[in-house]
C-alpha cells in the first residue's frame, strides 16, 4: 500500500498555519517505546514507565502529550508497540486529546527507525511539516517553559535546521550524554558544535564548570523533509528499509500497523548515532526549565516533593526518623512504614516489594534479570492486566479456583469465547452487563449473577455509559489465560 493511501483521512495531521504565528503548526511525535525495567516494580515490561503515574495523577505519557498541546501544536502522532496501542489510545482519550494517528511498531528498533517512519508519514501530507520528537517517559515540570523553548527553535527548524534542546545542567552528571553549544545563529538558538558521550566523573566536572555544555535530552525539532534528507545522507539503509515497511503498512482498527517482516529488517539504532552526531545542520536551544529522564528511583526521589528531612512519600506511607528516603505504597491494603532509614527506596505493591539503596537503584535492572531467570511473573506482569476492553485484577489464586475483579469500559466487549478447563461465575457489582451464554443473551445489573458452564460459548459487554465492574470466580483443573478459544473479537485478537 502506498503511503498516500495509508494516510488518507489524515489530512489534519499538519495544519498549515496557526493564527498566532506565520510558522506551520508543530506535530508532536510521541515516542512510546521502552521495556520498563529500571523502575520496577511500578514499571514492568507489560506496562512500562511512560504509562505509569510517577509524579502525579497522570502518567508520564499523558503529561508529555499535554505539554505539547494547545497553541502552536497540531494533533500528536504516537509511535508505540503493538501491546501498548490500546493503552495509548485510552490515556489520550482520558486527556481529551485526539491523536492524528497511532503508529504501531511490530517490535522496538530504537529511535532512528521510529523517527524515520514518522517523518515519512508526515511528509505525505506536507513535506515541510515541523515535527517534534518527544520521548514520552521524561519529566519536565515547567510545561510552559518547554513550549516557549520549542517556539524559540521553530524558526530555525523551518529554515532547515535540526534543532535539539540542551538542558541546563544542575550537576556533573555521568549518566547523560552532553552537548557543546557554539555561536548564536538566531535569537535563543546556537549552532551545535558536537555531541559528547557519557563522560567519566572527572570529565563531567569539567563540562559542568563550562557554560557551553548542556545535557542531551534526545528532543529534536525539524522539518520532515529535513530529517528524511539527513537519513538519506547518513543512514540510507535505515531510511530505505523503513520506507519499504511503511509502504506495506496497513490500517487496523484506527491504528496504522507497520509491516512486521519488513520492519524486522530495519537496522536498530538510536537517532543520535544514526543521524544527529554526523549531521552538520544541527542547532541547540538552551532549556532551563528543569528536566529528568526518570531513569532510576533516585531520579524519581529527586523530582518528588520532599519533607524537611528529604523524604518523599506516596500512598499509604509513613516515615519515622528517616532521611533522604523514598517510600511509596501502590496498594490500598499496604501501609508502608520506614523507621530510621537513610538513603533508601522502598516501593510496595500487592505482588512485589523493592527495598534498595537509593543511590544504587540502577541495580534494579539486575534484579529484574534475576526474576526473569526464575520465570517469576512479577518481572513482567503487573497485578492489574490491561486489555483493549479495560482491565482485570487477580484477587485470589489458589488450587482449582481464582477470583478476579474485571473492569469493562463503556461500549467495550470481551471476545466471544469458550474454555476447555474451567467454568465461571460472574457477579455484577457496578454498571450493567450484557451477557451472552450460548444462545441466551440477557442484561445483568448490580448484585445479579450468572453461571458460565465449562465449554459454553460466552461473552460480556458493557452497553452502558459508565464503567461496568464484576467479580469473576473461576473453578477448574487449569486456570491459565491461554485456556481460551476465541470465535469473535472486535479487537482482531486471535
Which residues does each predicted region cover?
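Conserved N-terminal catalytic core of the sugar/cofactor nucleotidyltransferase
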Residues: 16-30, 37-135, 139-145, 151, ...
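Conserved core of the sugar-phosphate nucleotidyltransferase
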Residues: 142-263, 283
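A residue-level structural signature of the nucleotidyltransferase/glycosyltransferase Rossmann-like core
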Residues: 131, 212, 219-220, 292, ...
Amino acid at each position: 500500500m502506498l503511503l498516500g493511501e495509508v494516510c488518507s483521512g489524515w489530512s489534519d495531521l499538519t495544519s498549515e498555519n496557526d493564527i498566532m504565528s506565520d510558522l506551520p503548526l508543530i506535530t508532536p511525535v510521541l515516542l512510546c517505546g521502552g521495556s520498563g525495567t529500571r523502575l520496577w516494580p511500578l514499571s514492568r515490561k507489560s506496562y512500562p514507565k511512560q504509562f505509569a503515574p510517577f509524579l502525579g495523577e497522570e502518567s508520564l505519557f499523558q503529561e508529555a502529550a499535554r505539554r505539547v498541546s494547545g497553541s502552536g501544536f497540531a494533533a500528536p502522532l504516537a509511535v508505540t508497540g503493538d501491546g501498548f496501542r490500546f493503552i495509548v489510545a485510552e490515556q489520550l482519550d482520558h486527556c481529551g486529546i485526539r491523536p492524528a494517528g497511532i503508529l504501531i511498531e511490530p517490535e522496538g528498533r530504537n529511535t532512528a527507525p521510529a523517527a524515520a517512519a514518522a517523518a515519512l508519514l508526515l511528509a505525505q501530507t506536507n513535506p515541510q511539516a515541523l515535527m517534534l520528537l518527544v520521548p514520552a517517559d521524561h519529566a519536565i515540570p515547567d510545561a510552559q517553559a518547554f513550549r516557549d523553548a520549542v517556539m524559540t527553535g521553530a524558526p530555525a527548524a523551518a529554515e532547515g535546521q535540526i534543532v535539539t534542546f540542551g538542558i541546563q545542567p544542575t550537576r556533573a552528571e555521568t549518566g547523560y550524554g552532553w552537548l557543546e553549544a557554539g555561536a548564536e545563529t538566531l535569537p535563543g538558538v546556537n549552532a551545535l558544535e558536537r555531541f559528547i558521550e557519557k563522560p567519566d566523573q572527572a570529565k563531567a566536572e569539567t563540562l559542568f564548570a563550562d557554560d557551553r555544555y548542556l545535557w542531551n535530552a534526545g528532543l529534536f525539532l525539524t522539518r520532515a523533509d529535513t530529517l528524511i534528507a539527513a537519513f538519506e545522507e547518513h543512514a540510507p539503509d535505515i531510511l530505505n528499509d523503513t520506507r519499504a515497511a511503511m509502504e506495506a503498512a496497513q490500517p487496523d482498527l484506527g491504528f496504522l500497523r507497520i509491516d512486521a517482516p519488513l520492519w524486522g529488517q530495519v537496522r536498530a539504532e538510536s537517532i543520535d548515532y544514526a543521524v544527529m552526531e554526523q549531521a552538520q545542520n544541527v542547532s541547540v536551544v538552551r532549556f532551563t526549565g528543569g528536566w529528568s529522564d526518570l531513569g532510576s528511583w533516585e531520579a524519581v526521589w529527586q523530582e518528588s516533593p520532599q519533607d524537611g528531612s528529604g523524604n518523599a512519600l506516596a500512598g499509604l506511607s509513613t516515615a519515622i526518623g528517616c532521611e533522604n528516603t523514598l517510600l511509596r505504597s501502590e496498594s490500598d491494603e499496604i501501609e508502608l512504614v520506614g523507621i530510621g532509614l537513610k538513603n533508601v527506596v522502598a516501593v510496595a505493591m500487592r505482588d512485589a516489594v523493592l527495598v534498595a539503596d537509593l543511590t544504587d537503584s540502577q541495580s534494579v535492572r539486575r534484579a529484574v534479570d534475576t526474576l526473569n531467570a526464575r520465570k517469576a511473573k512479577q518481572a513482567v506482569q503487573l497485578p492489574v492486566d490491561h486489555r483493549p476492553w479495560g482491565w482485570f485484577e487477580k484477587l485470589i489464586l489458589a488450587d482449582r479456583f481464582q477470583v478476579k475483579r474485571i473492569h469493562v469500559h463503556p461500549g467495550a466487549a470481551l471476545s466471544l469465547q469458550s474454555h476447555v478447563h474451567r467454568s465461571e461465575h460472574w457477579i455484577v457489582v457496578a454498571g450493567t452487563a450484557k451477557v451472552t451464554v450460548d444462545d441466551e443473551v440477557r442484561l445483568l445489573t448490580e448484585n445479579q449473577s450468572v453461571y458460565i458452564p465449562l465449554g459454553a460459548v460466552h461473552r460480556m459487554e458493557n452497553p452502558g455509559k459508565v464503567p461496568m465492574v464484576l467479580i469473576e470466580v473461576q473453578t477448574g483443573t487449569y486456570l491459565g489465560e491461554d485456556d481460551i478459544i476465541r470465535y469473535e473479537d472486535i479487537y482482531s485478537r486471535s
